[in-house]
Regions:
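Polytopic transmembrane helical bundles with strong interfacial aromatic enrichment
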Residues: 2-262
Length: 262
């Protein structure tokens, strides 16, 4: 990867991550299909219950419709984790930019933030579906939901900042890097808030005895599938940005040549 300070040039095609796109796409398709089948055909329902009509489980009236909330979990949690991973990569590239002032790192951070926003929106949608099925309402001002909503707003603010400083590359890159790092600070808060605040009613899944073996396997299959999908989407966005940069460079070169002939 070449380029001095302020360089915005991304590497040419043919780098080793580009060679992983097709295998990752195939892996995403296979694992997500397998995860869907495992979630709906193999993994046990809530508390291992087989509900016929409406039954009383753990003091709650449960129906087949309500049991869908447990199936949503197999997709809700993986997309949330992928959004955290994408934010981690964005924060890494933002730090690289702040250290080196090379704009290509800012571009990589922007690509990762786009993927993070996609998966954050998916997390919010699946989370609202789970909330509606499980708690009977679309939204609860519960600590986990609230902190994740704050995270989404910060990520949206990242793109607002980039638009606000569209004509000033230095400020755009610096301020957006700061917002990116601020969003990443919220990640451990989102993860730990249910453990730190006893009043939180959001379930804590990753704890001892929280998942049976078949549920954990289904969750891992879905997680691998969404991780592969996230990587593919990132490389597609990265490739599109690379083409846009090359096009802009060619247009600039042609303009300079025309000016020289004149």
């Amino acid at each position: 990867m070449k380029g001095g300070k302020g360089g915005a040039t991304l590497p040419e095609r043919g780098q080793w991550p580009d060679k992983l796109v097709i295998p990752a796409f195939v892996g995403a398709a296979l694992f997500l299909i397998a995860g869907f089948l495992l979630a709906f055909l193999w993994a046990p329902p809530v508390a291992g219950a087989q509900v016929d009509g409406v039954e009383l489980i753990a003091g709650n009236m449960v129906s087949n419709k309500l049991l869908l909330s447990q199936k949503i979990f197999y997709f809700h949690m993986p997309v949330a984790l992928v959004s955290f991973v994408a934010l981690a990569f964005a924060a890494y590239y933002s730090i690289r930019y702040l250290i080196t002032q090379q704009q290509r790192f800012d571009t990589c951070a922007e690509c990762a933030m786009k993927i993070s926003l996609v998966f954050i929106i998916c997390t919010m949608i699946t989370g609202e579906m789970w909330t509606r099925f499980e708690w009977g309402v679309w939204w609860v001002w519960e600590p986990r939901l609230t902190t994740y909503l704050v995270l989404m707003l910060i990520v949206i603010a990242y793109f607002v900042v980039r638009s606000a400083f569209a004509t000033n590359a230095s400020r755009r890159c610096t301020f957006s890097a700061a917002v990116c790092l601020l969003s990443f600070v919220d990640v451990p808060i989102c993860y730990a808030v249910t453990r730190l605040i006893p009043s939180s009613i959001h379930p804590v899944v990753l704890r001892e005895g929280g998942l049976s073996g078949d549920m954990a396997l289904t969750l891992c299959v879905c997680l691998i599938g969404f991780m592969c999908l996230g990587f593919v989407l990132y490389r597609l966005v990265f490739g599109q940005t690379r083409v846009s940069q090359r096009t802009a460079q060619l247009i600039d070169q042609v303009s300079k040549q025309e000016e020289a002939y004149e």
